[in-house]
């Protein structure tokens, strides 16, 4: 009984910190995707860099920008067989995206099946929308050997260009 109370208390106390770390990791991966070097940046600097360069945009599936929807209001649905994440509001599908001002780029969330799990990441396109600026993977359940390589720069650089 005491252990369960302590676990519940710890979970409650750490919830804000966990949410902060999830948001920080998201912002780090979006910034890394456009080539930002974050190695010397603390959390405050990362949030500041993100806020000054990245804006959230919501797109219809035809590519039109939707002005009156916040990305936080979209419900994500994961297709277990393909690993594809889809985003909905009132049963209408949208695509959350991000626009970088420096460097100019468009970033979209990506997901898909690997060998053992679904991989989640971000994919950045240069302004021409044809040239890949970068890719990052922030979540996967692949094995540490080959699967762990998706997080390494040498692997991610294979997609650039």
Language model features: what each stretch is:
Residues 1-161:
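Flexible, solvent-exposed loop/hinge segments and secondary-structure transition points
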């Amino acid at each position: 009984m005491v252990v369960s109370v302590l676990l519940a208390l710890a979970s409650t106390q750490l919830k804000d910190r966990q949410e902060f770390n999830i948001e920080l990791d998201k912002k780090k991966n979006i910034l890394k995707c456009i080539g930002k070097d974050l190695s010397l940046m603390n959390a405050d600097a990362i949030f500041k860099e993100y806020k000054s360069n990245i804006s959230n945009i919501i797109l219809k599936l035809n590519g039109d920008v939707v002005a009156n929807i916040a990305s936080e209001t979209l419900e994500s649905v994961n297709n277990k067989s393909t690993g594809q994440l889809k985003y909905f509001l009132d049963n209408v599908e949208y695509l959350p995206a991000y626009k970088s001002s420096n460097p100019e780029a468009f970033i979209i969330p990506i997901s898909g099946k690997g060998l053992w799990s679904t991989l989640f990441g971000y994919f950045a396109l240069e302004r021409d929308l044809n040239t890949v600026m970068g890719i990052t993977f922030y979540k996967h359940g692949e094995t540490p050997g080959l699967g762990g390589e998706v997080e390494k720069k040498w692997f991610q650089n294979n997609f650039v260009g």
